[in-house]
């Protein structure tokens, strides 16, 4: 059976994201009503952190526990990952003893190599190239508060980093637009951003383009 990973935003289809949002609404309703809901009972999430984090660790660890599962925290300082063990070997061992793996690391190549040797799904908790879980949460919040994001416009001001790259992928999946304003030398790189279809973004000169960029934006 093909293992489904979430390494960058475009790994999931629009239909799959809609299903996730429907389940999210159900889980939130049950949680607010103090109704136990443990679909992940006896399941284990391994969280591998090469880059430090507060919110990512808290959200994943609390989330898996609220759904009945358990979380194991690993970092490169106290595991073989920091002592030169090949990523592929680590993936085979860790995935034998877990049901799900989340990795927060530097290079996208590392998480892709891990996923290629893993027996269980792998989630990108952040890399230098992408931050899919962050934008997944952002879009769910927008839809929850304002309705459909289709056809809307998002403003991005700053360098074309991992978050920007992920917004651009999300725009292609959800069919909205992104107005991007970056400092000189930090413009969008379509290949690095992993764009695969019709462009859903427009670039504005920084800093003078920021005001024009933000006009009529929805987020």
How does the language model describe each region?
Residues 1-58, 62:
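Positively charged, low-complexity intrinsically disordered leader regions
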Residues 44-45, 49-97:
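Active-site cofactor/substrate anionic-group-binding motifs, chiefly glycine-
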Residues 50-62, 144-219:
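Glycine-rich phosphate/diphosphate-binding loop of Rossmann-like nucleotide-binding domains
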Residues 67, 97, 117-119, 174, ...:
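Short, structured coil segments at secondary-structure junctions
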Residues 72-94, 117, 169-170, 187-199:
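Active-site-proximal loop->helix
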Residues 76-79, 126-130, 183-186:
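Short, acidic/turn-prone active-site loops that include or flank metal/cofactor-
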Residues 91-94, 99-170:
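Anion-binding alpha/beta catalytic cores of soluble intermediary-metabolism enzymes, centered on
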